């Protein structure tokens, strides 16, 4: 939505459900929009979930006019798979972009060295440098590291307010991917339940 048309309804649902539903995403200067695309309550990471994480990282890593090479896509896919494997085994690791970044910087760097992956095939230092603004205290460190541990799968009413972010070249693509991943996840996993996606004033 744009224009806060659903703010009142969303607040009412949030209040009536004791905060369990009526989830409102918007951007404010003192409370910027944030997500955690790596978090799931049940640690289920199906094909769509993994692909959405890879697409999200690719969007932040590469410009529109800079398509990734096949070797880079494979390296990223392996990094995501190995990271998911690690957080499934060690539930003390908090799934978010920060821990993924740390994993690539330390563990995955060793994997690449052991496999003799050449820098021209996957430049891990360049990868980390480009994504550093989304890590911890970086300019966009808030964006993919939400501490709310919110799994949107079973939330029945979610509003994404795009007024402030629709012209932002960094935030808008991320929010769009999150919206599509949320809806696809509901379509695939919530069998026998009617779903609706409403695009208002698009």
Map each language-model feature to its residues.
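P-loop NTPase motor domains
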Residues: 7-21, 27-202
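Glycine-rich phosphate-binding P-loop
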Residues: 2
């Amino acid at each position: 939505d744009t224009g806060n048309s659903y703010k009142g309804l969303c607040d009412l649902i949030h209040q009536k459900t004791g905060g369990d539903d009526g989830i409102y995403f918007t951007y404010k200067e003192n409370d910027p929009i944030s997500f955690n695309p790596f978090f799931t309550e049940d640690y289920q990471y199906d094909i769509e979930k993994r692909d959405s994480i890879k697409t999200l990282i690719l969007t932040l890593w590469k410009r529109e006019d800079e398509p990734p090479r096949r070797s880079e896509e494979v390296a990223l896919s392996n990094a995501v798979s190995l990271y998911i494997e690690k957080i499934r085994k060690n539930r003390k690791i908090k799934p978010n972009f920060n821990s993924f970044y740390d994993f690539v910087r330390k563990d995955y760097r060793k994997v690449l060295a052991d496999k003799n992956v050449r820098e021209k095939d996957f430049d891990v230092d360049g990868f980390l440098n480009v994504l550093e603004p989304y890590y911890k205290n970086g300019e966009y460190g808030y964006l993919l590291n939400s501490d709310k541990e919110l799994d949107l799968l079973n939330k029945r009413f979610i509003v994404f307010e795009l007024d402030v972010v629709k012209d932002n070249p960094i935030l808008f693509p991320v929010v769009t991917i999150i919206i599509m991943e949320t809806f696809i996840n509901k379509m695939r996993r919530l069998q026998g339940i009617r779903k609706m996606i409403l695009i208002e004033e698009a």
